[in-house]
Amino acid sequence: MTASRKSSKTPKAAAARTSRRKAPRASRAAAPAAKVRLTAEVSSGGCACKLGPADLREVLSKLPVVRNPNVLVGNETADDAGVYRLSATQALVTTVDFFPPMVDDPYVFGQIAAANALSDVYAMGGKPLVALGIVAFPTGKLPLAVLLRILEGAGERVKAAGAVIIGGHSLTDPELKYGLAVTGTVHPSRVVRNGGARVGDLLVLTKPLGTGIVCTGIKKRVAKAEEEAFATASMITLNDVAGGLLTRFDAHACTDVTGFSLAGHATEMAEASGRVRFEIDSSQLPLLPGTARLADDGYVTGGARRNRDWLGARLAIARDVTPALREAVVDPQTSGGLLVSLAPKKAEAFEKALHARGLRPAIIGRVTARPRTSAVVVAVS
């Protein structure tokens, strides 16, 4: 399958096919520690809480670019993690992510927070080694058993990644937040950056979209049980398999799709790659069950609005793209998939390899040359 070939498969049909499969469980150990609704204790949750990309860039643009011969990846291209060379054969990959809960179960929240933090290391082609926990907890407002379950859930995912949590820091806060600072390793010559996409490449997305929309439905108590189950299963899934195959299939560029949305992170990739444009085939976008229904009913995030405003004219969407898909491309993702740019034959082999390992990737577009006045990311129907 190539991105240039039209398909009759609609996102709703893809979601329907997905929903016919039995929704995987987060964990048999995921019983809540107490009868609390974590989403009712916070104003918003997950990566939808990220500082808006426009505000973040305004501040970061005033800081000096890091100049150090051992810093292989710094703050100049909005990459997923920093990379510091230790020797000719080893470099450190380091990153941090934390946020308020987007689900009600403390154990599952811990799992999602850990998977989300680990993802940045995988997106760079690295392997996680150690993590430090970051806790902001409303002492006296929530029972300590909730915190214990969060830490247990995070520990389960970190252990599954072959890494260990070796410490952390905690403070009291009116709103619950949790996350990890993660350090991993990568060979200096095998770092995969977000810049490097080439004209003619195909774009592979390794997870379905819609976590921000579905989690809004969870918070508002309008998401169906099956919709919540699929979103949860997607968010706790590690990006280790896809990340581990990046160098095998000679990925030219990669990023993980999180709070700045598919369109936002695609724009960062395209701009870091030079005069290229990403053309997204909206008919190929995989959506989590319930995404279209909830989006059509207005359950979208403030983060989506901030993403859309920041992108402005750099994002062009064809008129016949459905309203739900228009929302999905700017929807903030929590623990989303990897967006990978590869040569066509490599992309098809990469997609096939992920399918063989039980994942549901999709080739969603292609990389073209960008005229000087053109949008950076284009979504077509």
Which residues does each predicted region cover?
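Helix-biased detector of long, well-ordered alpha-helical tracts
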Residues: T2-S381
